[in-house]
Structure formats: C-alpha cells, structure tokens
Design a protein with these regions (language model features):
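A short, proline-enriched helix->beta-strand linker immediately N-terminal to the Walker B motif
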Residues: 116-120
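Conserved H-loop
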Residues: 151-157
C-alpha cells in the first residue's frame, strides 16, 4: 500500500487490526466481519512503523507477549519463542533489552512478536524504511520467506517503488481516502 505522507495509510492499518474504530463501514478480513472484534481476536499480526518495543521486556518477553496475553501455557510459549528466535535469527539476543539491539534486530523482534500467535494476516508499517540497504535486502528476503512458509497474507506500507516491486504481488495506492489498485 502506497500513498502520500499523511494520507492515512497508518490509520487504515490501525483500523484493520482493531487499534482504531472506523467512523463508518466495516472491516472484513478473510471473508469475516471483524469490525467489532477485539484486536487479539482478529487473527492479525501488526508491525508498527517504530517497532513499538516494550522498553523493560527482553527479546524473549517481547516474542512471548501475545501468547501470554492469550494465557497460553508456559511450555507452549517457550516452544514458540524458540521457534521464532531461530527462524528470525535472534536466538542469541533472547536476554537483551530493546535499547541494546540494532535497527535490523529490532525489526526482526517486532516481526517475531507479530507472528507469535500465528496470524493469517500480517500488517507491516514501513518495516524497512529505517534500515541500510544490506539490512533492507536481508529483511525483505526474510519477509518473503515468512509469508511463503506460513501462508500469510501481508499488507505492507511503503514509500519505495523498489520495495513494492520486490515484495508485492499487488500494489495499491491510498488516494483521497480510497484504496485503488495501481496498473502493472
């Protein structure tokens, strides 16, 4: 999803994931009206633009957060945290706090937190924008692999045409409050 700065892309993601209520209309995800469901009931993972790390949580606690909220058993949480840490290349960082992570590490942890509850839809708000070119390429490859291996549909906000060409199957623009598909 592309569009001018300030056109409402982030607001749209927040409405889809349930952090804001729409003024009118409905939110349909996977043929299901989720407009009035709580965020945790929508089957959506969300990676905000800034990563939104909890400053006093270790990487291990960040990755297990969604499962703790859902009152999952400790052994299930520990297993899922280990799976995600290995898959995302952050196993060696599990006991670190966010302030001791690089930008790329923070993005991997934010992605892991969003994937913890095994969502069917992943919302990504400019996850590559603050990274250098090499890290951007690495994380783009990781995002593609995660989508493919987990069968996840992703809605990815970007300002970069190159990024959309690399990651997108379909490119949309938010223009005048309407989402429109762009021609190939």
């Amino acid at each position: 999803l592309m569009g001018r700065t300030g056109c409402g892309k982030t607001t749209l993601l927040e409405i889809i994931c349930g952090l804001r209520q729409p003024r009118r209309g409905r939110v349909i995800v996977a043929d299901r009206d989720v407009t009035h469901e709580l965020p945790g009931e929508r089957g959506i993972g969300y990676v905000p633009q800034d990563g939104a790390m909890f400053p006093t949580f270790t990487v291990r606690e960040q990755l297990g957060f969604a499962l703790r909220l859902r009152r999952r058993p400790s052994d299930e949480i520990n297993t899922r945290v280990s799976e995600l840490a290995g898959e995302l290349g952050v196993a060696h960082l599990l006991d670190r706090l966010p302030q001791h992570l690089s930008g790329g590490e923070r993005q991997r942890v934010a992605l892991g937190r969003a994937l913890a509850a095994k969502p069917k839809v992943l919302l990504l708000d400019e996850p590559l924008s603050a990274l250098d070119e090499e890290l951007r390429d690495d994380l783009a490859a990781l995002l593609k692999r995660v989508q493919r291996e987990h069968g996840i549909t992703a809605l990815h906000i970007t300002h970069s045409r190159a990024e959309s060409a690399t990651l997108a199957d379909v490119v949309f623009r938010l223009d005048g409050g309407r989402v429109v598909e762009t021609p190939d």
